[in-house]
């Protein structure tokens, strides 16, 4: 029996020598792309995902235990997910293993993001070492299908050289899994979006972050946007969304209300349905999390409020919008 999100079958595998014995639970599956499709065990799948930070479910702190992982992933399961993006760094091993047991495919990444020192050799060695450590630890986790090498990195020649080396390093260590990165979109003319990044040639999927309706216009802009892509690869939106304070209500046009976030997700879902070759999404983010960059008093209070679940575990209205779409997708891919 091959491992799938619907039937996450694991086998006990024992290895022994004269001096040592190792036992592990391992699943078996295949993963590949074919044109704009992602194929798991030669069957097309849609990655119904969500992004997750390594934070405890009901209070501020670093998640580290199996119980923490199970709670976070149970929310993702209720949302209708079969996939999680563990951002923006390798999460603890309990999270990856619990995701495997519960039937979640995984995008795992290293913290190469924004504007780092691309031409610094020590910076590259740091990134490569984290990449090697991540792959060495989780190479036998069948649910990990994407190694991500970057997040929101502005275009430049030094950046491309840096990430090219990382992509090549991934494939030298693991030539089976998919290589991704969270690139950035571009509005080539009013209402027409694409990804125009030479890094995309090195990746197995066209993966990118976009915040149409939040950092880019209002929610109604989603109604006017169309997407075009030249490459025949699966399209994957690694981040989308907007913020809301749980319990804050008002007009659908008033930012940080649950109604604005709900409306944004409704319009976003309709926009996503128009994207050619879309094979997966991981909206930002499952749960509100601490962020010292977020200072709006009585709303943010040093929290990023883009979660579909509050920092206290309360589900916002947008949670149920995404849940409804994911349930529809689950039925359509049966």
Regions found by a protein language model. Name each.
Residues 117-124, 148-174, 183:
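Active-site cleft segment of glycoside hydrolase catalytic domains centered on the general acid/base Glu
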Residues 1-106, 127-130, 136, 143-146, ...:
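Secreted/periplasmic carbohydrate-active enzymes, especially glycoside hydrolases
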